[in-house]
């Protein structure tokens, strides 16, 4: 079941009460936003009608409209909790897509890496979650990753391994743990190894 609306904010996909756990003063009808971006609008119109259907899990691909907000990881946590509650299963898988590389128009160029950092933090906040990395699937010239098959395959690998029991698959992407510098070199340690695009193998 696909429910989507391009260019929307995460607040639109959750209840006002869930959003206020992160941002207590958020408005239900903020005139700054387009109609579809107001808090709970898409949740009421495009998620609630689906809750009588059986679902195995969720795939979430959003974030551009919330770039640079340092509460985004908490928003994701509340969104996953809300949706799981509506389906009555606190362990429903929640797999999401990392924002792909792209040259945004913010002067300092920090909104993308800060949002990716928030998405990475969400992995630790949301149990039974996973992130499909797009570091090698994007382009600085287009906001939509040109290697869409790669993105879809990585989401599928997460679901096959973690939800459907194909334990031998490699599904996670490399995840940074720490770095140290010595003798003019940077030695990077990863928490996990995993799948990478062909140019990195």
Identify the residue ranges that each predicted region occupies.
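Cell-envelope and extracellular/periplasmic
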Residues: 1-201
